[in-house]
Amino acid sequence: MLKFIKSSTKESEWLKNPKNEICFVGRSNVGKSSLINALFKTRVVKVGKTPGKTKLINFFEDERGNSVVDLPGYGYAKLSKEAQSEISDMIFEFLTKRVEIKKLFLLIDSRLGFTPIDQEFYDFLKEAPFEIIIVATKRDKLNQSQTYQIKKSLDELKVKYFLVSITKKEFLQDLVNNLFN
């Protein structure tokens, strides 16, 4: 079970003294909110059909008091350049100043692989003091050859990754087992 704690846009509003904090980040419409709902078997995280729905940093807590953070999506082209910049700045500020983060789950669309903006984001974060785990979503949309290609490209990064289907609820249990350990 997961419960909503608060939303914020600036550091003074962030959740204070979280326990065991994990964060989910990725491009708009990659499935961050849907993945959190699937992993925690809840519907507490608002999911929108339109990209760019999450514009705030949303803090949740599980039944053990662990903190789960749903960050806004980056790179949504239909937002103004100013709005895109504000969201990117908010994400970068959070990820560079937030010392409580234990793990960051970077979501990518497995159909697209690592896009230039995903690569830029990963390059920025790879020296961070927390573990980065790649979650390639929308596995159900891939054929066998495409699945092989995305696995091959992720293997080359030499980083822990999971290839999942949120809609079919496939390959999620291994990810659940890696959330807080």
Curated annotation (Swiss-Prot):
<comment type="similarity">
    <text>Belongs to the TRAFAC class TrmE-Era-EngA-EngB-Septin-like GTPase superfamily. EngB GTPase family.</text>
</comment>
<keyword id="KW-0131">Cell cycle</keyword>
<keyword id="KW-0460">Magnesium</keyword>
<keyword id="KW-0547">Nucleotide-binding</keyword>
<keyword id="KW-0342">GTP-binding</keyword>
<dbReference type="InterPro" id="IPR027417">
    <property type="entry name" value="P-loop_NTPase"/>
</dbReference>
<feature type="domain" description="EngB-type G">
    <location>
        <begin position="18"/>
        <end position="181"/>
    </location>
</feature>
<keyword id="KW-0479">Metal-binding</keyword>
<dbReference type="GO" id="GO:0000917">
    <property type="term" value="P:division septum assembly"/>
</dbReference>
<dbReference type="GO" id="GO:0005525">
    <property type="term" value="F:GTP binding"/>
</dbReference>
<feature type="binding site">
    <location>
        <begin position="70"/>
        <end position="73"/>
    </location>
    <ligand>
        <name>GTP</name>
    </ligand>
</feature>
<feature type="binding site">
    <location>
        <begin position="26"/>
        <end position="33"/>
    </location>
    <ligand>
        <name>GTP</name>
    </ligand>
</feature>
<keyword id="KW-0132">Cell division</keyword>
<dbReference type="InterPro" id="IPR030393">
    <property type="entry name" value="G_ENGB_dom"/>
</dbReference>
<feature type="binding site">
    <location>
        <position position="54"/>
    </location>
    <ligand>
        <name>Mg(2+)</name>
    </ligand>
</feature>
<dbReference type="InterPro" id="IPR019987">
    <property type="entry name" value="GTP-bd_ribosome_bio_YsxC"/>
</dbReference>
<feature type="binding site">
    <location>
        <begin position="164"/>
        <end position="166"/>
    </location>
    <ligand>
        <name>GTP</name>
    </ligand>
</feature>
<feature type="binding site">
    <location>
        <position position="33"/>
    </location>
    <ligand>
        <name>Mg(2+)</name>
    </ligand>
</feature>
<feature type="binding site">
    <location>
        <begin position="52"/>
        <end position="56"/>
    </location>
    <ligand>
        <name>GTP</name>
    </ligand>
</feature>
<keyword id="KW-0717">Septation</keyword>
<comment type="function">
    <text>Necessary for normal cell division and for the maintenance of normal septation.</text>
</comment>
<protein>
    <recommendedName>
        <fullName>Probable GTP-binding protein EngB</fullName>
    </recommendedName>
</protein>
<dbReference type="GO" id="GO:0046872">
    <property type="term" value="F:metal ion binding"/>
</dbReference>
<dbReference type="Pfam" id="PF01926">
    <property type="entry name" value="MMR_HSR1"/>
</dbReference>
<feature type="binding site">
    <location>
        <begin position="137"/>
        <end position="140"/>
    </location>
    <ligand>
        <name>GTP</name>
    </ligand>
</feature>
<dbReference type="InterPro" id="IPR006073">
    <property type="entry name" value="GTP-bd"/>
</dbReference>
